[in-house]
Every structure is written in structure tokens, then in C-alpha cells.
Amino acid sequence: MTQRLPSSMSFGEEEEPDVLQKMMQKCKEQPFVPIGSLLTAGAVILAARSMKRGEKLKTQKYFRYRIGFQLATLIALVAGGVTLGQSSLEQKKTKEDQLREKAKLREKLWVEELERRDAIIQARKQRLEESKKELRDLAKQGFEDEREVDQGKK
């Protein structure tokens, strides 16, 4: 008989979000950071373009914008980290509680599955014993019938 894992056992049931989903989640949590990053990148691109054209004043202006956008992005990042740090502790506690409950449920399902299998095995053993007893009784009766026939012939 092959050993199968109980149906309550599951591996990798919880999907890890892919990179794009993680990025979208972070953007929703701190929307000013990606906006600041895009503005900074735009300022650098415009500065590079104006530098290539030889427009020194515009280049300086765009680099100043870049510094301002980077500062705003950094402030948004720090402020978001502080506010999210507090809420993430609460979320972490609730997530740990959920994981604990899920582990208890899995353990309960595992035990129920083992008990069910044990009941099946016990029922098979009982049927086997009943079959053995029935065969013994039939064999005994057959031997007795043979003896009676043998004694009747003598």
C-alpha cells in the first residue's frame, strides 16, 4: 500500500506576489515616492538634453529641479516609512495571528485525516478477523461433517 499525504496537507498554497505586484503595492502605500522618482528622472533627462544642446542656464535649472525633487522624494520616503512602520507592526501582529490560526486549522485537519485513516485500518483489521473466524468455523464444520461421513461408513 502506498503512503499518500492527507488531503489537508498542502505545500506552497500561499502564493508569493511577483515583483510587479509588490511594486504596485508599494506605490499604493507611498504614492509620492514613485512620483518624486519620475520627476527626478525627468529633470535629469531634460538636463542631459539641454547640456547636449549647450544651454547652460537651462541645464543648471534642471539640475536644481532634480535636487528639489530628490529632496521631496527623500522626505516622502522617510515620512511614509515612519507612518507605515507603525501600521505595519499592527498588520504584522494580525498576520501572525492569522498564520497561527491557519496552522491550528491545518493541524486539526491533519489529526482528523489520521483518525479517519486509523478508523479505516481498524475496520479492515476487524473484517479480516471476522473472515478468519468464519473460515475457521467453516473448516471446523467441514472436518466434523467429514468425520460423521467417515464414521457413518464404518
Curated annotation (Swiss-Prot):
UniProt key word Protease: no
UniProt key word Coiled coil: yes
UniProt-listed GO biological process terms: mitochondrial cytochrome c oxidase assembly; mitochondrial respirasome assembly; regulation of proton transport
Keyword terms of this UniProt record: Coiled coil, Membrane, Mitochondrion, Transmembrane, Transmembrane helix
GO CC terms: mitochondrial inner membrane; respiratory chain complex
Residue ranges of the TM segments: 31-48, 63-85
Family annotation (Pfam families): HIG_1_N
Residue span, HIG1 domain: 4-95
InterPro entries: Hypoxia_induced_domain, RCF1
Cellular localisation: Mitochondrion membrane
Membrane topology term: Multi-pass membrane protein
Domain of life (superkingdom): Eukaryota
Main location group: mitochondrion
Coiled coil regions, renumbered to chain: 89-144
Protein family according to the UniProt entry: Belongs to the RCF1 family.
Subunit comment: Associates with the respiratory chain complex III/complex IV supercomplex.
Function: Cytochrome c oxidase subunit which plays a role in assembly of respiratory supercomplexes.
Protein's name according to its UniProt entry: Respiratory supercomplex factor 1, mitochondrial
Species name: Lodderomyces elongisporus (strain ATCC 11503 / CBS 2605 / JCM 1781 / NBRC 1676 / NRRL YB-4239)
